[in-house]
Amino acid sequence: MPPTLLLSQDLPSLNYTTPGDRLDGRWRESLSTLLGLGRAAGADFVEFFLEKVNYVSCLAEDDAITSLTPRLSSGCGVRVYKGKGDCYVSTNDISFNGLRTALEKGLSILGLTLPAGQSFVPELNLEMLRDYAGAKEKDQWLHRCSPMQEMSDILLGANQKLDHYASHAQSRRAAYFRDWQEVLVAASDGTFARDIRLTQSVGFSLFCADGEHRTSIGKRSGDTSNPDYLRTWDAETSAQEVAESAGKMLYADYVESGNYPIIMANQFGGVIFHEACGHLLETTQIEHKTTPFLDKKGEKIAHENLTAWDEGLTDNAFGTIDMDDEGMPTQRTLLIENGILKNFIADRTGSIRTGHPRTGSGRRQSYAYAAASRMRNTYIAPGNYSVDDIFNSVEKGIYCKQMGGGSVGATGEFNFAVSEAYLVENGKLTKPLKGATLIGTATEIMNKISMSSQDLGLAAGFCGSVSGSVYVTVGQPHIKVDGITVGGR
């Protein structure tokens, strides 16, 4: 029987990395028995996703720490398939009896029952444990992260730097979180895999005001494999960049609404491709028939100069994973090549229901969610143009340096605020602009991305969908969109 987790009241010092608490090969016998019970009951497929989390967030507002929040959780999600139907049950009781009860509930939802108590049920054979955590010595990561006092000191020092560089600052916020997650996946196809993930993010948010003039600028970065990440954060440079952007936007003119060619900066500019197109290439959308690309595989859906990828392999990128939450090794997935749709993003359920092959993209926020097809590191590939080539091609347009929030409809209609923009005239930046909103549809914008530079950049992001919020990377080089509706004044 697997070990029982005992929670300490001393949250700051608690960790799950002592040998007796790990999710590892010692769970094989219990999970093999449970999987055998599920198959004997008539299920076509059964999966257990076990998880332990040690999370902490820290917020500094101006010159005080206003929030320091540790959170611990553990639990398991049980998924049962019968034909193309499935159900999902989660529990925070990870004892053998707790997992058996969750399995029994899942089976009953599909009209199945566990074998009688005296029945002989053979254990299901699991593969040798694929231990991504052990292979990369991830078991030591949590011990090496910044303790809470160090988090607080670094963020307060960062806010002082921001105060030094910013003018007319009304609110300075520095925020950090560390999310340590251990997962173990066992399934009736023999899958038996373990991993530890360490996700960290830190950044600034600055609000400035001078009379009637207002502006808000934020900047975050993230990492997935460096326990020393917070210690090595370049708060000085980040503070300078945020303060400089805020200073330019504070007195910027409002943009005039109209249709313009736009140049989008690299890195976080890729959020529009992620939101307006990437989600439409997830098999979840195919299942619900809410994507305009439903039957377009092999057809042209974008400008011939556009190639795009989704992958989980780039070192330290925010969406990088060694395996997905269904135990499948990650990989590179070519989405679009020279404008032609090549592949969709698929999890197990999406593959069963749509026929598209799995891509190592089954992801979830936690054990409370069933995995679904989700993006990882998604970006437009570098092109053959220089940044100067792109700017020189624009007689009058808008340069979108930083993107803000936005919304996307089920079939790809979007609007996104631009938090830092500039007027482009004859290939040159002439003045800062504020109040710009980009409005369009996925099918429209994809065919108007006519130029891509060679300076691919990636940025950390957070993506919400049916399986909760997951960590992702968005990215692109500088790109030109030949024309798009820009809302303004």
Swiss-Prot record:
Record's InterPro entries?
Metalloprtase-TldD/E_C, Metalloprtase-TldD/E_cen_dom, Metalloprtase-TldD/E_N, Peptidase_U62_metallo, TldD/PmbA_N, TldD/PmbA_sf
Q: Mind telling me which SUPFAM superfamilies this protein's record contains?
A: Putative modulator of DNA gyrase, PmbA/TldD (SSF111283)
Biological process per Gene Ontology, one example term: proteolysis
EC identifiers of the protein: 3.4.-.-
Q: Which residues cross the membrane?
A: none
Q: Which UniProt keywords apply?
A: Hydrolase, Metalloprotease, Protease
GO (cellular component) term, any one = cytosol
Which GO MF terms does the UniProt record name?
A: metallopeptidase activity
What this chain does, per the record? Answer: Probable metalloprotease.
Q: Which family does it belong to?
A: Belongs to the peptidase U62 family.
Q: What is this protein called?
A: Metalloprotease slr1322
Organism (species): Synechocystis sp. (strain ATCC 27184 / PCC 6803 / Kazusa)
